[in-house]
């Protein structure tokens, strides 16, 4: 083993986390085997026995959205039965999708010292964060992923703080998704018989947004690790753009089996987050998902997390309780909920249980 590689492997945390090399830096060294710090327990790895190969999440064509009420019904049904669906003919131009994917690669190909300017230790703002894995300080086994997280406050802040390698493309992608997000949420609220989205509800549903750029390098021994461990999102909705490599798996409702989300050119993946599960009093399902590592290809994805504001109180919507439903969840300060999620390693649906009424 070359001396440089031996030195890196003896102190992976410094190299990967503190020096900003990320897991991409490890992969670029031509590793022949997976470092022990990334080996996941057997129960956290996906196996062929737990995957259903002839099933997948719904694909919904939005081309008739304005004229056909069945489209809204399909959206609500998918949110109830799957918590995940793909949308096509959504109105976001294909070139916008391709440009934000290219910008993601451009950022992660920057030198480590350039990316590290945006790390937890160096970034001038908590709203811009480059990192690796999920919560390295709390994980027994690391995840094979690097990320850039950009919390949107204003165009002015983005211009000042977001990395120039991907800033314009990330903003353009977010702007182009805004109309789709609003229409999705309007359809989902209609399915709950909530017909008016006032200022308070708009804040609860889409008061804040964060866009992530995720990079999953080619991995030695991919079967021993994960790109992302089992979790559900803390968002209201997540709008995910994935590339053509594949690797996203979704747990089928009320089962221990998983289905692959096949890449469809031009499609966007939508999933219900914990906040919407709580707001809908459990009607819409925030489902566990995970990403496998890949031994042959690098993979990227670009999710937009649509969230309540940090100081919003989330709980079952009043309209649902007024109709006689019993509350399944308590009211929770959203920032407390998010802190609970980020203080620990990925652990499936444990966070949403934190909000349940015992």
Curated annotation (Swiss-Prot):
pH relationship of activity: Optimum pH is 6.5.
Function: 2-oxoglutarate (OG)- and Fe(II)-dependent dioxygenase (2OGD) involved in scopoletin biosynthesis. Converts feruloyl CoA into 6'-hydroxyferuloyl CoA, and, at low efficiency, caffeoyl-CoA into 6'-hydroxycaffeate, but has no activity with p-coumaroyl-CoA.
Catalytic activity as recorded in UniProt: (E)-feruloyl-CoA + 2-oxoglutarate + O2 = (E)-6-hydroxyferuloyl-CoA + succinate + CO2
Residues noted as binding 2-oxoglutarate in the record, renumbered to the chain: 216, 299, 301
Induction data: Transiently induced at low levels by fungal (F.oxysporum f.sp. batatas O-17) and chitosan treatments, in association with the accumulation of umbelliferone and its glucoside (skimmin) in the tubers.
MF term (GO), any: 2-oxoglutarate-dependent dioxygenase activity
Protein known as: Feruloyl CoA ortho-hydroxylase F6H1-3
Pathways per UniProt: Phenylpropanoid metabolism
PROSITE patterns assigned to the protein according to its UniProt record, in alphabetical order: FE2OG_OXY
EC number: 1.14.11.61
Key words, A-Z: Dioxygenase, Iron, Metal-binding, Oxidoreductase
One GO BP annotation of this record: phenylpropanoid biosynthetic process
Cofactor note: Binds 1 Fe(2+) ion per subunit.
Domain named Fe2OG dioxygenase: residues: 200-308
Enzyme class, UniProt record, top EC level: oxidoreductase
Cofactors required: L-ascorbate; Fe(2+)
Residues annotated as binding Fe cation: 231, 233, 289
Tissue specificity statement from the Swiss-Prot or TrEMBL entry: Mostly expressed in tubers, and, at low levels, in underground stems, stems, leaves and petioles.
Organism annotation: Ipomoea batatas (Sweet potato)
Entry's family note: Belongs to the iron/ascorbate-dependent oxidoreductase family.
